Amino acid sequence: MYRTNTCGELRLSHLQQTVTLCGWVQRVRRMGGMTFVDLRDRYGTTQLVFNRDSAPAELCDRAEDLGREWVIRATGTVMERSSKNPNIPTGDIEIAVGEMDVLNRSEVPPFTIEDETDGGDDLRMKYRYLDLRRHCVRSNMELRHRMALEVRKYLDGEGFLEVETPMLIKSTPEGARDFVVPSRMNPGQFYALPQSPQTFKQLLMVSGFDRYFQIVKCFRDEDLRADRQPEFTQIDCEMSFVEQEDVLSTFEGMAKHLFRTIRHVEISEAFPRMTWHDAMKYYGSDKPDTRFDMRFVELMDVLKGHGFSVFDSAAYIGGICAKGAGSYTRKQLDALTDFVKRPQVGAKGMVYARVESDGSVKSSVDKFYTQETLQELRRTMEAEPGDLILILSGDDLMKTRKQLCELRLEVGSQLGLRDKNKFSCLWVVDFPLFEWDEETKRFYAMHHPFTSPKPEDIPLLDTDPGAVRANAYDMVINGVEVGGGSIRIHDSALQQKMFELLGFTPEKAQEQFGFLMNAFKYGAPPHGGLAYGLDRWVSLFAGLDSIRDCIAFPKNNAGRDVMIDAPSVIDEAQLQELFLELIPNEN
């Protein structure tokens, strides 16, 4: 037996017991005739003591020679520490070591294996196996494990079956780019890695598996952000004989179960619901952060037509009221202006107005507006003395709202209104079924081609497709879309109509999705579902800024795994075996 206990379990109740521990040397300290070694494993850290007054000199000499991250086994007696460490669970005890074996030496690690490390992102990604030894990273993996267990426990209790679907599937042109896999046995043909198990879970509904789930890897070849990776994990679910209300109730229940069991937060009230239209109107985003208010107020009637050309020519003027921010200095306001003018935001500038202690309003465009008009602005914004009004305008309604959204989030962060330990959950519902692309002059499915329109909007498919609302819904927590889904189309004729509106010829629709259309001919039940992003849930509960920190071996922002150096070139023999030839990139 290599060990009798772990480095995180010994307490005062174990005093005088002889134990054997294994782990990695965190640090070595020498004080007089004593050497202290912090020994670490997955479970915690325990202090080892080598005392020259009671232990063999040869053993103490070897202890002094130990290096960081050496792997050792130590046997000794559990003793009470004279100088306790309240910061760790094992801080009341130490091990007086009588025997020690070095199981493996280590080179000096390229960065310190501590929560507060000196290693940069790139270096830690290259040596991810060392980064995973850090407690803060390891705890994210443990959180992920516990969440996956609770997901399975909840869904099993609700009668769901976990069914695995294929990883090598057919490529479809809609949505993000596919990762493709050449087939050696079928020259010139390719599989795709699934962006989601969407069509397979619908086929399972046709098969009679009325409640399905799986925790599944999905793949999308798209530009990366803090909340995106080329491969990610979904909690994928589907239900038969349900309406939207049934799906929302089931998965709101799962969210509450996770809050209760993982975060120990009890949520009794129902999640509020907001239409997509209201989310865009008041927050400029279909995933609004509702931890704080600061809703948009349209100001066209108040500010247009007063000789200020920027506003007079605008298609939209919107403002937010930052409560208590009237003390912002000119330097802070200039920094906010620079923020909205960054290419990532794209605004041309920002106008501000502050409400003074006497109720008067002082603005950055005073020469264009009378105090009477500024007081009307104050009333419209419901601003009080000490408040700050921030205003953006533009000639594109949706674009300007998105810019105002970025400003709102930035100000919310500056004012401490986005506490990671406070959670605000809601459903966003009634999405548009289609979105119009000006460049290609065609409709695209806002979610996917299998989303059902609201029954009362079906007649609009022939007259005004852009006005059709979808039976779709997203769960949003703290401005993060943690999951989304829809009621699916289960009628072949309606599905065919959907394909036509999306620009599919009957031949193309049959080529891409004929297997699903054929299945619908054999009695497809009404069905719907949802997919949660497990990575996003974990990062939310862990208070992380990026999902990368809750994935064991993530890719960097260029989609590369710098640890194993992937993607990489393959041998010419492999290319020939796959009947592939590389064309030089002239760029």
Curated annotation (Swiss-Prot):
By its UniProt entry, which InterPro entries does this protein fall under? Answer: Aa-tRNA-synt_II, aa-tRNA-synth_II, aa-tRNA-synth_II/BPL/LPL, Asp-tRNA-ligase_1, Asp-tRNA-ligase_1_N, Asp/Asn-tRNA-synth_IIb, AspRS_core, GAD-like_sf
Q: At the top level of its lineage, which domain of life is listed?
A: Bacteria
Q: Which compartments does it reside in?
A: Cytoplasm
One GO CC term of this entry? cytoplasm
Catalytic reactions of this protein = tRNA(Asp) + L-aspartate + ATP = L-aspartyl-tRNA(Asp) + AMP + diphosphate
Coiled-coil segments, which residues? none
Q: Enumerate the residues binding L-aspartate.
A: 174, 220, 447, 488
Task: List GO BP terms, alphabetically.
Answer: aspartyl-tRNA aminoacylation
**EC number(s) given by UniProt:** 6.1.1.12
Please name one Pfam family that this protein belongs to: GAD
- Which of UniProt's keywords are assigned here? Aminoacyl-tRNA synthetase, ATP-binding, Cytoplasm, Ligase, Nucleotide-binding, Protein biosynthesis
- SUPFAM superfamilies registered for this protein in UniProt: Class II aaRS and biotin synthetases, GAD domain-like, Nucleic acid-binding proteins
Per its record, what are the GO molecular function terms? aspartate-tRNA ligase activity; ATP binding; nucleic acid binding
The segments labelled Aspartate in the record are: 198-201
Q: Could you tell me what this protein does?
A: Catalyzes the attachment of L-aspartate to tRNA(Asp) in a two-step reaction: L-aspartate is first activated by ATP to form Asp-AMP and then transferred to the acceptor end of tRNA(Asp).
Q: Cite the record's note on assembly.
A: Homodimer.
The family classification in the record reads:
Belongs to the class-II aminoacyl-tRNA synthetase family. Type 1 subfamily.
- What protein does this entry describe? Aspartate--tRNA ligase
Organism of derivation: Porphyromonas gingivalis (strain ATCC BAA-308 / W83)
Q: What's the name of its gene?
A: aspS
